[in-house]
């Protein structure tokens, strides 16, 4: 008799390959279920989820490792009110000793400098030429200034980037004494490290959610922006001191130096007032201690440089004057570049946490200080626009885009905080007028248009001749060295803002001047997805439901949806998206609601020819995959600590977002294994032999009962 091995049966093998209901003969409707149930066409929510996942992956690739680590996500999730402890920021600084936070910007800047090669001698001569042009507009007439050398180049790109990136200085010995020169080099090296620490602090201080306000982040932003205004006051004093020294060298006679702006305030007074009356010094908050220490370190290096400029002995002759001018421009370029980082980072995304957002008084004061400094010192110091800076930096803009997209996917609509900022930007944008730019104003040096050409062609040719009547102006550069479109002067409407992602885009309206000292060229406000018909102040409770439920209640998923405001040909509808409602807004809202409801529920003309009617017993076209899951992050808190706020996160299992710590909730520890029941042991007869034990008491009771019965019988 042959013994059959288990598992070798043909029936068992068939069951592994064929559904059980087909084997039993019940195959009614199985093909339809397999076809329509197995259809893998992505749902709209799945597509949005995949797009947000791609944004998150792109953002994570551009960030330092500490910003996306699990430990930082867990520590931020345990905080309330979207706050960031300063200890976490300090940990971020310690984790980035090689300045990985700015690697993309440094790479783009190095590539731009490589396309416009200038030797140290050429750059020094070009800086000196720009300085003579500046000095003629500052000092009264009667001062003999050397003539411009023929065929010199435009040093704007190198002045903007080289002092910050190049380790070697152009003017290594600007002082006669060797000890003073060594002190100058050491102070500049320490200043660079101190400026990097402040930039790192700003980079790592961002909370986890940009759609909600953050109190401590707003305080830190106020401190940083107030610190920018202090930097420009110090820079004005440094340039004033250099001008005074150069004028004395050019005219040794007792000619009185009368600058147009007057004598600026001494740096010691400016620094002391900021440390005593600055935003972080007057609030008494303990969440800015490391920031105040970093600011004090920078101000200490600036004080040492100011003392060297005021008391250091310079070399005589032409070389002494050249070294004085070049060293001043180098140091001020480092500080100016650092101030641009803070301002442009605020405009790129950090402004969502600022007090009053873009109407922040410290932001306005910082931009005004930069504008005044660039106007006074033109054409020495160029200024980079915020879109150009964001295209070079990459990581900050990518992070804000991914974070806001994830919040928009979870909630289905922008938060009230985020939407208020968009309304503010849109309301200011409606006051701007557009006009065709003159052809000569839209061209940069060498006749090239501001949006095209290469950096090498733009900066390697001869410098453009400036008219003697208006004062010279400093160019504004894009990341490749292209001059940016100028800003409208005060009192005139500014042009509409182009898209920051389009390097060839030119605004339709330029200023009435050929070039300006400063350009504030922001981005077009991002378009909002379609909201509920009711306004943001009358938002229905259904807005908190999952997106599938809300969209199913509003109509079929295959209805066309309008994303963003109306096209530009309908300005009234576009303005109504963001502007404040007028007196007749209630009546208009009711009429719009009724019209949109009729249009939404009305059948389309071609519905019958396109779609088939699915009967009730036919089954669904595709199987809905549950996409919304709710995670509650329960953190262990002490008895005195406030409970951590739970957060909700959407997840589609079909389109995995990956193991990113900023998307996935922190893993919960596995529950302890269940304890096995202990065996019931025999009960120990405790106190059985003692006088009051249970055994002796029972025996005594029985003995007394027996004696009573025997006594009765004996009677």
UniProtKB/Swiss-Prot annotation:
GO terms for biological process: regulation of DNA-templated transcription. Residues 444-455 have a biased composition (Gly residues). Residues 432-513, 585-605, 659-680 are annotated as: Disordered. Belongs to the herpesviridae HHV-1 VP11/12 protein family. InterPro entries: Herpes_UL46. Its main location: virion. Phosphorylated by host LCK. The phosphorylation seems to be lymphocyte-specific. Residues 456-467, 475-488 have a biased composition (Low complexity). Residues 664-677 have a biased composition (Pro residues). It is a peripheral membrane protein. One of its GO terms (cellular component) is viral tegument. It is found in: Virion tegument; Host cell membrane. Interacts with VP16. Interacts with host LCK, PIK3R1, SHC1 AND GRB2; these interactions promote the activation of the PI3K/AKT pathway. Interacts with host YWHAB. Interacts with ICP0; this interaction targets UL46 for degradation by the proteasome. It comes from Human herpesvirus 1 (strain F) (HHV-1). Pfam families: Herpes_UL46 (PF03387). This is Tegument protein UL46. Keywords: Activator, Host cell membrane, Host membrane, Membrane, Phosphoprotein, Transcription, Transcription regulation, Virion, Virion tegument. Plays a role in the activation of the host PI3K/AKT pathway to promote cell survival. Interacts with and activates host LCK and thereby recruits downstream partners SHC1, GRB2 and PI3KR1 in order to activate the PI3K pathway by phosphorylating host AKT on its activating residues. This mechanism is inhibited by the viral protein US3 that instead promotes incorporation of UL46 into virions.
């Amino acid at each position: 008799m042959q013994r059959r091995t288990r598992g070798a049966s043909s029936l068992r093998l068939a069951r592994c390959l064929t559904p059980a209901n087909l084997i039993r003969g019940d195959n009614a409707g199985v093909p339809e279920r397999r076809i329509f149930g197995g259809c893998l066409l992505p749902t709209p929510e799945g597509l949005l989820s995949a797009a947000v996942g791609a944004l998150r992956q792109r953002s994570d690739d551009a960030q330092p490792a500490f910003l996306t680590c699990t430990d930082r996500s867990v520590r931020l999730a345990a905080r309330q009110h979207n706050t960031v402890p300063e200890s976490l920021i300090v940990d971020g600084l310690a984790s980035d000793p090689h300045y990985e936070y700015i690697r993309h910007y440094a790479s783009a800047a190095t590539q731009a400098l490589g396309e416009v090669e200038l030797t140290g001698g050429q750059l020094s001569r070009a800086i000196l030429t720009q300085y003579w042009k500046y000095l003629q507009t500052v000092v009264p007439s009667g001062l003999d200034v050397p003539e411009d050398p023929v065929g010199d180049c435009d040093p704007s790109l190198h002045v903007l980037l080289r002092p910050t990136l190049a380790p070697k200085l152009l003017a290594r010995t600007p002082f006669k004494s060797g000890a003073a020169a060594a002190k100058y080099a050491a102070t500049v090296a320490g200043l660079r490290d101190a400026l990097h620490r402040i930039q790192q602090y700003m980079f790592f201080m961002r909370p986890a959610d940009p759609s909600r306000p953050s109190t401590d982040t707003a305080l830190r932003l106020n401190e940083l922006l107030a610190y920018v205004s202090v930097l420009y006051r110090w820079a004005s004093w440094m340039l004033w001191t250099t001008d005074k020294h150069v004028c004395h060298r050019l005219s040794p006679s007792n000619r009185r130096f009368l600058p147009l702006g007057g004598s600026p305030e001494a740096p010691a007074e400016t620094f002391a007032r900021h440390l005593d009356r600055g935003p972080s010094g007057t609030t008494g908050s303990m969440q800015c201690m490391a920031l105040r220490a970093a600011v004090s370190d920078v101000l200490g290096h600036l004080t040492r440089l100011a003392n060297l400029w005021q008391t250091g002995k310079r070399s005589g002759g032409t070389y002494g004057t050249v070294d004085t001018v070049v060293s001043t421009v180098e140091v001020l370029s480092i500080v100016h570049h650092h101030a641009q980082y803070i301002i442009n980072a605020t405009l790129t995304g950090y402004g969502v946490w600022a007090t009053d957002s873009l109407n922040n008084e410290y932001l306005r004061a910082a931009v005004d200080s930069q504008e005044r400094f660039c106007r006074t010192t033109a054409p020495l110091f160029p200024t980079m626009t915020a879109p150009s800076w964001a295209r070079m930096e990459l990581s900050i803009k990518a992070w804000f885009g991914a974070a806001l997209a994830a919040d928009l996917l979870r909630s289905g609509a922008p938060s009230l905080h985020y939407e208020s900022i968009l309304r503010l930007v849109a309301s200011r944008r409606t006051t701007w007028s557009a006009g065709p730019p003159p052809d000569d104003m839209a061209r940069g040096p060498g006749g090239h248009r501001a949006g095209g050409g290469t950096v090498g062609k733009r900066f390697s040719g001869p410098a453009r001749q400036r008219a003697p009547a208006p004062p010279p102006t400093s160019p504004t550069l894009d990341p490749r060295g292209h001059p940016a479109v100028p800003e409208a002067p005060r009192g005139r409407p500014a042009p509409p803002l182009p898209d920051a992602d389009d390097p060839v885009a030119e605004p339709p309206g330029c200023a009435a001047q050929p070039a300006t000292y400063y350009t504030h060229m922001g981005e077009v406000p991002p378009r909002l997805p379609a909201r509920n018909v009711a306004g943001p102040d009358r938002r229905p409770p259904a807005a908190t439901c999952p997106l599938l439920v809300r969209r199913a209640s509003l109509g079929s998923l295959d209805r066309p949806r309008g994303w963003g405001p109306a096209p530009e040909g309908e300005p009234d509808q576009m303005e109504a998206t963001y502007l404040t409602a007028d007196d007749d807004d209630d009546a208009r809202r009711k009429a719009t609601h009724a019209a949109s409801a009729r249009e939404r529920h009305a059948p389309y003309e071609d519905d019958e020819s396109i779609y088939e009617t699915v009967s009730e017993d036919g089954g669904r076209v595709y199987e809905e995959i549950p996409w919304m899951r709710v995670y509650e992050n329960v953190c262990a808190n002490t008895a005195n600590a406030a409970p951590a706020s739970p957060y909700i996160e959407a997840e589609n299992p079909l389109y995995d977002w990956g193991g990113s710590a900023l998307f996935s909730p922190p893993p919960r520890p596995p529950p302890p294994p269940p304890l096995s029941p202990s065996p019931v042991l025999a009960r120990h007869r405790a106190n059985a032999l003692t006088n009051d034990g249970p055994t002796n008491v029972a025996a005594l009771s029985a003995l007394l009962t027996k004696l009573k019965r025997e006594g009765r019988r004996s009677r």
